[in-house]
């Protein structure tokens, strides 16, 4: 219809907060009902548009949830343009998880060069950003992850100084070192 945009979902994000939404346990937000669309910010492609600000082929970040197609009036959409090189980055390092890690560390943690920072969930969307930004700030970064493979990844790909496997039998000894 007039002023509307037809969107096709291409990328979905599984963000840490969603786990709480998929349980009826007490949480800061209500759980998703069986018959409801899971909330989330997918990256979609404009299929058809009757809206002057959007053209077919544009990539958009929306709040339309986990569904194949959605119709929008443009409210709340972020147009990434038709030539976005890596649109999925807007769901991770350039999106909510990356922003959370970056701002949380710098505004709340306020790390100083030479300090040691311990990062839980070191290979997760938020933890991986926290560790990398802390390294840029001159910190010694100790990650915690579940499994030797994740720990290797944190050190080799994200630049953590060391990573402790919380599943290892000798975790207390690792922490003491």
Feature map (PLM): residue ranges:
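Short, glycine/acidic-enriched capping/hinge loops at junctions between secondary-structure elements
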Residues: 18-22, 125
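Short loop segments at secondary-structure junctions
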Residues: 47-52, 74-76, 83, 167
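A structural motif shared across PLP-dependent enzymes of the aminotransferase-like
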Residues: 63-76
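Glycine/charged-rich beta-loop-alpha catalytic/anionic-binding loops adjacent to active sites
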Residues: 75-90, 114-116
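Mid-domain Rossmann-like dinucleotide-binding core that forms the NAD(H)/NADP(H) cofactor-binding site
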Residues: 91-174
């Amino acid at each position: 219809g007039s002023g509307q945009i037809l969107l096709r979902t291409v990328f979905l994000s599984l963000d840490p907060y969603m786990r709480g939404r998929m349980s009826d346990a007490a949480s800061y937000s209500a759980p998703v009902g069986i018959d409801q669309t899971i909330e989330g910010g997918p990256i979609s492609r404009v299929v058809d548009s009757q809206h002057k600000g959007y053209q077919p082929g544009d990539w958009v970040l929306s709040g339309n949830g986990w569904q194949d197609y959605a119709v929008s009036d443009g409210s709340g959409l972020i147009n990434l343009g038709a030539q976005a090189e890596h649109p999925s980055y807007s769901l991770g390092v350039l999106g909510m998880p990356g922003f959370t890690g970056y701002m949380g560390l710098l505004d709340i943690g306020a790390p100083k060069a030479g300090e040691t920072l311990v990062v839980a969930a070191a290979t997760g969307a938020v933890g991986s950003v926290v560790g990398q930004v802390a390294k840029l700030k001159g910190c010694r970064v100790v990650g915690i992850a579940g499994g030797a493979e994740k720990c290797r990844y944190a050190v080799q790909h994200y630049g953590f100084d060391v990573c402790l496997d919380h599943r290892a039998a000798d975790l207390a000894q690792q922490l003491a070192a």
